[in-house]
Amino acid sequence: MLMLITYDISFDDPNGQARLRRIAKHCLDYGVRAQYSVFECDVTPDQWVVLKNNLLETYDPMCDSLRFYHLGSKWRNKVEHHGAKPSVDIFKDVLVI
């Protein structure tokens, strides 16, 4: 299933940048960066549980925000891409890690 993950991490405290890096790393473990704070992750239900738990353990609910969008398996009908950055089809395009 395709998950769209967005986040906003506060830099008002000294740990903000470290949280930002950890959140991005967790997302990169399962997907690709679509924009600075937006990731597209193709995960199984079990992987989603692990990823979501990692993200919820990392962010600070008092000053950060996370959003999870369940796009499911028929996501191609729900996503349109326009603009300069090329779109990555995580099911078709080759990713080199």
Predicted regions and their residues:
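Short, intrinsically disordered low-complexity segments
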Residues: Q35-G72
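Intrinsically disordered, low-complexity boundary segments flanking structured domains
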Residues: K25-C27, K52-E57, E80-A84
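Extended, hydrophobic alpha-helical segments
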Residues: M1-A34, V38, D42, D46-Q47
